[in-house]
């Protein structure tokens, strides 16, 4: 006992210092070990999140590709068939051609000239209107289906708890979904008369200086078609052409839709407002211009290949070009699986990029 007391008195300071060091070291070890475990847990969580992100990206890519297939195999064929029938019904040139054929030797020169001039206007109106309608309707439907598909994917992810960013997204009612998709028929069922009238006015303005004996070459035909398109697109207020594709905008609705707290606004109206915002965007206007130009160039090139050697390339009188224009109608409005023009537009790099970015633009 005396030995212990003596040892303590003699080495107390050293013992306390040693104990303090050991205690501090143990505490530091525990802190380090705890910190290391937290870092390991965090790394596992981050790895899990990255894995989930990759899974979601893969699922989104697959869903995006399936949506494009739905457009090409289901939605677009129905719309194109409906459009083709309506254009044939509304712009019928057969009665003019019949009068020209039946009146040979019986019509006076002024009567014959008037009929040829009517045929000229109607032929160009029908060709350009068909070209414009097919292009715009195909792009519009693709916008619709991508917007709807994106919302449906988001709603599914929300229901499964796959994303913490989707808490405020409302589920789409089945009726709203069907109503939204069926609104693509607006062009054919509601807007066609005014579209024909305005397109015919544009054709008359561009063609008023062209005579039946004027020589039409490939380049002249391309320029003429694009001039009619440009006059039509630039007449009226900016983006007036959107009102041929969808019902006119309700400004009151647009304001209330921007307020996410207004539950009285249906999902259908939210989808329609979002669609209109896409259509009036600079990016969409750009792909419209690119698509219409591409369609026109390919169509005229195809017309050239179907003429006799040295036809449009060297030039033909306008009167002899009109029957060729009539032959293009079935080609322009052919079903999507056989429509070369739609396939070319769909595969344009600018169009592909636009719809990829549109689908990837997840609502916050």
Swiss-Prot record:
Pfam families cross-referenced by the UniProt entry: Peroxin-3
Recorded coiled-coil stretches: 33-62
Gene Ontology BP annotations: peroxisome organization; protein transport
Transmembrane region(s): 15-32
GO cellular component: peroxisomal membrane
Keyword annotations from UniProtKB, A to Z: Coiled coil, Membrane, Peroxisome, Peroxisome biogenesis, Protein transport, Transmembrane, Transmembrane helix, Transport
Keyword Translocase: no
Localization terms from the record: Peroxisome membrane
Principal location listed in the UniProt entry: membrane
Key word NAD present: no
InterPro entries the record matches: Peroxin-3
Membrane topology: Single-pass membrane protein
PANTHER family per UniProt: PEROXISOMAL BIOGENESIS FACTOR 3
Free-text function comment from the UniProt entry: Involved in morphology determination of peroxisomes, but not in import of peroxisomal matrix proteins. May act as a docking factor for PEX19 and be necessary for the import of peroxisomal membrane proteins in the peroxisomes.
Family: Belongs to the peroxin-3 family.
Protein name: Peroxisome biogenesis protein 3-2
């Amino acid at each position: 006992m005396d030995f212990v007391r003596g040892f303590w008195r003699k080495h107390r300071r050293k013992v306390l210092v040693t104990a303090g060091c050991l205690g501090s070291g143990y505490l530091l070890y525990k802190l380090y070990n705890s910190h290391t475990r937290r870092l390991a847990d965090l790394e596992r969580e981050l790895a899990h999140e990255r894995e989930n992100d990759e899974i979601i990206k893969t699922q989104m890519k697959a869903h995006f590709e399936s949506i494009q297939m739905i457009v090409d195999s289901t939605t677009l064929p129905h719309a194109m068939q409906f459009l083709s029938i309506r254009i044939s019904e509304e712009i019928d040139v057969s009665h003019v051609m019949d009068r020209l054929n039946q009146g040979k030797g019986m019509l006076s020169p002024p009567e014959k000239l008037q009929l040829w001039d009517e045929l000229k206007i109607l032929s160009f109106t029908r060709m350009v209107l068909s070209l414009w309608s097919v292009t715009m309707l195909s792009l519009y439907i693709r916008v619709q289906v991508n917007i709807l598909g994106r919302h449906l994917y988001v709603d599914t992810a929300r229901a499964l708890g796959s994303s913490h960013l989707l808490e405020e997204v409302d589920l789409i009612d089945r009726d709203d979904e069907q109503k939204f998709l069926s609104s693509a028929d607006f062009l054919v069922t509601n807007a066609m008369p005014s579209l024909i009238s305005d397109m015919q006015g544009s054709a008359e303005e561009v063609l008023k200086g062209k005579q039946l004996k004027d020589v039409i070459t490939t380049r002249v035909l391309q320029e003429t078609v694009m001039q009619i398109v440009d006059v039509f697109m630039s007449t009226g207020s900016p983006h007036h052409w959107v009102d041929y594709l969808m019902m006119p905008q309700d400004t009151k609705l647009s304001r209330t839709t921007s307020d996410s707290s207004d539950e009285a606004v249906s999902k259908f109206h939210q989808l329609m407002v979002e669609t209109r915002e896409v259509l009036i965007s600079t990016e969409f206007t750009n792909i419209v211009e690119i698509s219409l130009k591409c369609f026109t160039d390919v169509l005229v090139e195809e017309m050239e290949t179907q003429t006799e050697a040295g036809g449009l390339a060297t030039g033909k009188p306008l009167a002899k070009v009109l029957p060729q224009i009539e032959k293009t109608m079935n080609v322009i409005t052919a079903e999507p699986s056989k429509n070369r023009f739609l396939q070319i537009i769909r595969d344009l790099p600018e169009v592909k990029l636009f719809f990829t970015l549109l689908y990837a633009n997840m609502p916050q």
